[in-house]
Amino acid sequence: MERNHWNEKSSGAKRSRERDLTLSTIRSILAADERLRIKASSYLGVGRGVDDEAVIDIFPTGQTMSFLRLLHGFLGTCRGQSMHQVLRDPCVLRKQLLYGVCKTLFDTITVRRVAEEWKLHAALFPYRALDEEDLEQYLLVWSASLRQSVQTGVLGALRDILYQYADNDDYGLYVDWCVTVGLVPLLDVKTKPSEAAERAQFVRAAVQRATETHPLAQDLLQANLALLLQVAERLGAVRIANAPEVRVFKKVRSERLEAQLRGKHIRLYVAAEPLAYERDKLLFTTPVAHLHEEILRYDGLCRHQKICQLLNTFPVKVVTASRHELNCKKLVEMMEQHDRGSDAKKSIMKFLLNVSDSKSRIGIEDSVESFLQDLTPSLVDQNRLLPARGPGGPGVVGPGGAVVGGPAGHVGLLPPPPGPAAPERDIRDLFKKQVIKCLEEQIQSQVDEIQDLRTLNQTWENRVRELRDLLTRYASRREDSMSLGARDAELYHLPVLEAVRKARDAAPFRPLAVEDNRLVANSFFSQFVPGTESLERFLTQLWENEYFRTFRLRRLVTHQGAEEAIVYSNYTVERVTLPYLCHILALGTLDPVPEAYLQLSFGEIVAAAYDDSKFCRYVELICSREKARRRQMSREAAGGVPERGTASSGGPGTLERSAPRRLITADEERRGPERVGRFRNGGPDDPRRAGGPYGFH
């Protein structure tokens, strides 16, 4: 009942309008948020999850891609790497499926069905003798023929089905993901109705073809047709993702591992979860992750060996190194040049400046005198050159032409002057010679300086060229590392001439003159190729130890100790094959195959599954029952039946009344005993005792 307010409007109507307005507002907010989310996700790309959560990429990355490359021989191939091929053998899965299906088929048989088969055989080929050896041979022939018929029919049908639907590399891809990343991306394949009908038709046709002449095998397979269809359907319903668009990542906040294929989420099976102890980085615990660093080191040595083999083919190779140009000899030469007293350029420039500043004859004479004294002070006789300006003032000519004068009483013998113009000519000639000498020295010094600068320029040019080559080489190495070594791997597959050309481009050798500023560091007069045998043996041991200890593979050896084969063990089946069978194919009801059966052929595996099944036990039961019944009938036929009323040894007048027994007529003896009754004291023989493969000896 609604209450009316003074404005004649009910409170319920008011609340209804407010509720509608609130709901409308909420819807508008949600719609706007959805549009914003869609627009934001279109800009974020695949690097984010649906909820914009930060992720750590696991695959593909440079590290995980190198895992796959080195696993299949593209990096660091050695003898021990073949251990992986043993583990990824697809025949293991086919033999596991064959054994599991056969064991299930043979265990579904009933003892009544085996007894009916025996009755049919006994009615067609009745046994008429009472000899135990003949009876045992008769039963042996029946059991062996029944066994062969069933095994042939089952083997033919299952072989066609397995090679049709299990003849792919999914198991190998599963093993590759397990030993490299530890995570297996799974792609569920949607089956169309037409494909399901075609698969069912193929299975029925395979059963019909294989069991046309084996009725019991046909009945057995027809009764278990649902199991065969399930195996074929599961083999085609799941695929291991094998495409460049596969992406595996881990969400940081929720710590969930997810996989995507072309932007769509797919299933992910976790075989070995990576460790997340470092921020924004995962540590892998797989066998290949443990071997990764050693494989890269070995691969680098192999590439170095290949480059040396391609390049070190010339008769002589010289490696030079730069040495410092300021050695001892150079230092001494520079010191001597610096300590030299006279400088021709400075002297002639000083002379020209003095002459230009002179205003009189006396100033010019002083300039000439200073110039000559600076150049050749010991070769010029100042008294003869300028008698009036000698160092001792005006001299006194003594007898015989001796001139006495000077501060220390210098006495010199001078020849008589040839004439008034002789001193002037001597000064001119000497001045001209000195000027020419100064110019020659100046020119020579300029030439020497030019030569030194040229040598220094050549040295720096060589240095710049070396630095440029180093930069080019480092840039090429960076490009090679970004391209994951694809170009380096081509050296092993290219023709010789093409490989030599690429190697020379990568590490060019050029002729170089050994100058004064370079010295010879090393030289090669023959081909040098480093050895990799020791490192290869070490890496092989690492491969074997890692796989043997992780998966517990079994090594088969001959009597001489030589290795014959490396096979799966029971632990390997439980570690590798059963997870694929249970978690991926969803066929966990199949029994695991024993390790001893993995070395057998398909026919031998079917025979082994027959021996381990109830089918074989029921056949043994029927044979034991027939032998016991025949023994009982033989004892009854061998013993006589006394007449009634015959006196016995118990005493006079006493009669022994025996149980009434029917005598066997000649016709019954000719036709053989009736197939009635059960055995009393018989027991099944051991089918595994020595003497034959099937028992009944």
From Swiss-Prot:
Keyword list, A-Z: Coiled coil, Host nucleus, Viral genome packaging, Viral release from host cell, Virion
Extent of Basic and acidic residues compositional bias: 664-689
Signal peptide, first to last residue: none
InterPro entries with a match to the protein in the record: Herpes_Portal
Region named Disordered: 633-697
Keyword Coiled coil: yes
One GO biological process term: chromosome organization
UniProt organism field: Human cytomegalovirus (strain Merlin) (HHV-5)
Subunit structure of this chain's protein: Homododecamerizes. Interacts with terminase subunits TRM1 and TRM3.
Any GO CC annotation of this UniProt entry: host cell nucleus
Record's keyword annotation contains Coiled coil: yes
Location in the cell: Virion; Host nucleus
Job of this protein: Forms a portal in the viral capsid through which viral DNA is translocated during DNA packaging. Assembles as a dodecamer at a single fivefold axe of the T=16 icosahedric capsid. Binds to the molecular motor that translocates the viral DNA, termed terminase.
Protein name (record): Portal protein
Family classification: Belongs to the herpesviridae portal protein family.
